[in-house]
Design a protein with these regions (language model features):
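C-terminal helical subdomain
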Residues: 2-3, 184, 235-283, 293-297
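Short, flexible, mixed-charge acidic loops at enzyme active sites
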Residues: 164-169, 223-230, 270-281
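C-terminal amphipathic/interface module of NAD(P)-dependent oxidoreductases
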Residues: 287-316
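A short C-terminal helix-loop "cap" of Rossmann-like NAD(P)-dependent dehydrogenase/epimerase domains
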Residues: 172, 227-239
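Rossmann-fold NAD(P)H-dependent dehydrogenase/reductase core
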Residues: 2-226, 308-314
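Alpha-helix initiation/capping motif
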Residues: 114, 181, 244, 288-292
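Alpha-helical packing segments of well-folded alpha/beta enzyme cores
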Residues: 60, 191, 251-254, 299, ...
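Charge-dense, low-complexity polyampholytic segments
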Residues: 73-77, 268-281, 311-316
Length: 316
């Protein structure tokens, strides 16, 4: 009796084909999201850039097409900071099914004062977490129509040292930009893991995976005309950082693997291999601050109340 050939090791430079698949990348016009889109486009997948800025989306698509002959890439207007606008995204996609969504769009503020979305939510929590929570709700019919869709949540290494304050999710009492950012990304990661628990309990074919890019710097990122320009000064200044960190092209690798690799399972956490900061994508143990399912369930309930929608409402 012959045995199946061993699965070859994952190679970020020789990705499997994904012809016929449709993937939405929020914030796909810049940064890590751009490189997620570029790398997925090279597999033959149809990649949709979710962007609030049409001009930047056009530049990103032009860059991808220049590097990937025959790339199937287009854009939809998408602003995760505007909850009401997300209702129309599924229709705007113009597809019968969605094989994956990469929840990548986000905002990080370095300095006070505290800012809010048009819906009255703290800007980072509202954009990074609540927007993607609500978007998932509206995308669920398309995701459920695919044979084995994946929801990929882009977390952050900045979340690893944080704890959620469930009584101050909007940072009204304690607003420190870096802490608030880390907590917003932690909320996102809790969502991704809790969503998978609910998907599994309902017997859904959709899986939810959490990833993070490690330490991904602009100064270590290759140039893409119209999207990102790397100067000689930036290259020189970034040399010491390259020992521990990486560019945003490499920060995209965990998300790309989570979309494409059949060995990746829902409820897993993936990040860079070397200390969680750089290198090839690999599976990590779920962080200790993500292990409390009671916290995750309470966050889910709060998110449902704040957005008025529930991504798991129609499961089962």
């Amino acid at each position: 009796m012959s045995s199946a050939p061993p699965t070859p090791p994952w190679n970020v430079r020789r990705l499997p084909r994904a012809d016929g698949s449709v993937v939405l990348v929020t914030g796909g016009n810049a940064g890590i999201g751009y490189f997620v889109a570029e790398q997925l486009a090279a597999t033959g997948a149809t990649v949709v850039l979710g962007s609030r800025n049409p001009a930047k989306a056009e530049n990103a698509m032009a860059s991808i097409r220049a590097r990937v002959p025959g790339a199937q890439v287009r854009a939809v207007r998408l602003d995760v900071a505007d909850l009401a606008s997300l209702r129309t995204v599924a229709d705007a996609l113009g597809v019968e099914r969605l094989d994956a969504v990469v929840h990548n769009a986000g905002v990080a503020l370095d300095d006070p004062p505290r800012q809010e979305t048009g819906d009255g939510h703290e800007l980072m929590f509202g954009t990074n977490h609540l927007g993607h929570f609500a978007l998932t709700h509206w995308l669920m019919p398309l995701l459920s129509a695919a044979p084995a869709a994946r929801v990929i949540t882009m977390g952050s290494f900045a979340a690893k040292s944080e704890r959620l304050d469930l009584d101050d999710l909007q940072s009204r009492r304690d607003y420190r930009p870096k802490r608030t950012y880390g907590r917003s990304k932690l909320a996102q990661m809790h969502f991704g893991l809790e969503f998978d628990r609910r998907l599994r309990a309902a017997g859904s074919t959709v899986a939810s995976v959490v990833v993070h890019p490690g330490g991904a710097l602009d100064s270590l990122t290759p140039s893409r005309p119209g999207v990102h320009t790397k100067t000689a000064a930036a290259r020189l200044g970034a040399a010491p950082a390259a020992l521990l960190l990486q560019g945003k092209h490499a920060g995209a690798w965990p998300a790309v693997r989570a979309v494409l690799d059949p060995a990746v399972r829902g409820g897993q956490l993936w990040g860079p291999r070397a200390f969680g900061l750089r290198g090839e994508p690999h599976r990590e143990p779920v962080w200790a601050n993500l292990a409390d399912t009671t916290v995750a369930a309470r966050l889910w309930d709060a998110s449902r109340d704040l957005t008025g929608v529930d991504p798991a409402a129609h499961l089962g």
